[in-house]
Amino acid sequence: MTDNQEIKPKKLTLGNSKLSLNKSFDSLTGAQSFVNAKSKTLVEVRKSSTGSTTTISLNQERNSLDHTAIDANKEEFNRRLSILKKAAEQSKLNDTSQISTLSKLASINQSANSKIEPLETDKEVEQKQQNNEENKVEVSAKIVQDNEHIPSQISKKKEESFVKSPLVGMRTRYGIELEKELDKTADSKVVAPKIKLEEPKKFKKVDLFNMLGDDESGRTRSLASIKRAREKEKRKLASQAPEKVYREVTIPEVIGVGDLANAMSERVADVIKELMKLGVLANASQTIDTDTAELVATNLGHTVKRVQESDVENVLISDDKVEDLRMRAPVVTVMGHVDHGKTSLLDALKSTDIAASETGGITQHIGAYRVTLADGRAITFIDTPGHEAFSEMRSRGAKVTDIVIIVVAADDGIKTQTVESINHAKAAGVPIIVAINKIDKPDIDIERVKNELYVHEIIGEEAGGDVMVIPISALKKINLEKLEEAILLVAEMKDLKASPFGPASGVVIESKIEKGRGTLTTILVQRGTLRNGDIIIAGSSYGKVKKMTNDKGLEIVEATPSVPVEIQGLNEVPFAGDKFNVVQNEKQAKDIAEYRMRLAKEKKISIAPRSSLEDLFLKASGNSKIKELPLIIKGDVQGSVEAILGSLLKLPSDAIKLRILHSGVGPITESDVSLAHASSAIIVGFNVRAGANALTAAEKEKVDIRYYSIIYNLIDDVKAIMSGMLDPIVREQYIGSVEIRQIFNITKVGKIAGSYVTKGIIKQGASVRLLRDNVVIHEGKLKTLKRFKDEVKEVREGYECGIAFENYEDIREGDTVEVFELVQEQRQL
């Protein structure tokens, strides 16, 4: 019985104790749980900052809900919900305070501009926690909203199943229904995000700014990412093959391989490969012809524009506009014979004494001067030498001049250089004014001079011609005003105009080299304006104008048309008469100079004297009779050197040739001496001297240096030297005749001819010519000359003598013997 009573189950009843939560929500603020709608498993997030390890499992929450359904009433359930809301709000406040703390920390780090690597890891963790807490708050809020609709359902179901459902070891029907309701709510509204817990990484300053910024679109990229993006873009561009550009290539007559590659923007190696395909082996520095260059360019896909080499000078061609033309001063050239008073006339016109500095009163080179008259008008005069050696210089002067003044001495009349000057002026088509000088001398005849001019078709105005003839006296300054008026009248009739605008151009009057100043060039500007710093090309010389000096020695900065100036800066000495032009840059000037040098070289080769076949045989055998006189000529100005060369090359050179090793402007140098020593040459200096070192070297090497100040003395001496080098002329001089009357045979001597001197004299050892019936049968020398038995040196006319010939005994009675001597005479050119 007792046993039965003990094992009898007790009836389930409600206790008096009140249902309560064992843990407060304060301890749950460190951790929150939510339901994954799909897997129905718990996703747990822990905060490292709070250090709480509290975890609420899904089973505990469900059991708690079951007990709540059994024991709690509606008021108790509402109280729970309010507590949950407070917990959610408290969690949000904690997260907000943490974010504000991090913001302050970031601002402090930004202002201090210091490294923040220790804070960067915490910041990343805080950012993740913030995201997690936001998700948790959203889930809690949604659960609360759903639970507000649950109490009514709970009350109904509690009444139906409160008594029926067993509670021990079982879940109540209300708990099951609540679980289903929660599952529906989770399926419909709550989707728990999947959160990955990664290892924290170090943050940079830019990342902090990005986390704290509100506008995600305005975030700045890190420098490393920008750098990586740029490198990626570069690699992308490098991997893409650039599109080839095809050009129009300008090809001259001759072009270098490297220049052709540059013109096409191709690699030199590619150009060389194309040349090899064409069978041409060339490197980058070698030149090829136009046709080959065109084939290479065409094969590479480029178009070709062929130009001639002479096209480089096209930049020098320019036309002046009519509205730019202005009146300019006339350029007057003074010509005439030696010592007729050309320089004295210029002295009188510009009131200077130039003639005093000229050797012997003879002008040695061209001078250009500008004279300003009383009314302000100007005249430019060019003085040319009167010696015949300067005919080329006079012809150049006639080409650049507007008016020619022919100076004729009233007491001397028309001479050779006067006629030559008239011919130059006529050939140039330049108006002529005749100035009859020295009318102050007694016993002069002006009419005779005018009549001589008529012979050369120079007819004065008084005789119906168009030439103005003005009698003057340069020494007494008579009628100089009339001469100036005549010049200005002719200039006005010609309407001389030029444009002072644009690049300058003109003519080289003279050039020289001066120690300490370099190359000095006298030029005459014909158009445009020349300024300091302009780059000019004159012949094959070029350079930048460094300094300009006028005819009075004053430095100027610009020169207008008809103004003669002396400039410094050319790299070489140009020739008198060369045209000069201003170009844009030094490259243009260099290209033009190189082109002109090639032309001059080709011309020199084409006109070089060719040796005859006989001369070549003589040289090959070593028996050449042609002699050479090597010379080195140095002068003070280029025009004088040219005049000397022109005169020397006119000398006859049949038996001897004049060889000019070197000619130039400037003093005699050591290199000139070395060249003269190596070639056994004579150095000729015209108005220049040798330096101390050059003199020492000349004495040591025994080099002959000769100085001259007058050109015709130099020419005469060179002519004499050449004549002395010629072989002498051998001439026969007849001295007598002998008639053979008897033949004697003498033992050990041979035949002796008894003779009678019929004419002249006979000398021992003289040359003889044996004639028989007026035919020469022997020519030799006398071996013996005796009178009776004595040897004598000579026998005169009317005396008898005995004679014998060397190595010849075929003599007969009646033969005639001519006696003569061989005389040598010096040859002259």
UniProtKB/Swiss-Prot annotation:
Residues 437-440 are annotated as: G4. It is found in: Cytoplasm. Residues 361-365 are annotated as: G2. Residues 327-497 form the tr-type G domain. Residues 383-386 are annotated as: G3. InterPro entries: EF-G-like_DII, EFTu-like_2, IF2_II, IF2_N, P-loop_NTPase, Small_GTP-bd, T_Tr_GTP-bd_dom, TF_IF2_bacterial-like. One of its GO terms (molecular function) is GTP binding. Transmembrane segments: none annotated. One of the essential components for the initiation of protein synthesis. Protects formylmethionyl-tRNA from spontaneous hydrolysis and promotes its binding to the 30S ribosomal subunits. Also involved in the hydrolysis of GTP during the formation of the 70S ribosomal complex. Belongs to the TRAFAC class translation factor GTPase superfamily. Classic translation factor GTPase family. IF-2 subfamily. This is Translation initiation factor IF-2. It comes from Rickettsia akari (strain Hartford). The lineage of its organism: Bacteria, Pseudomonadati, Pseudomonadota, Alphaproteobacteria, Rickettsiales.
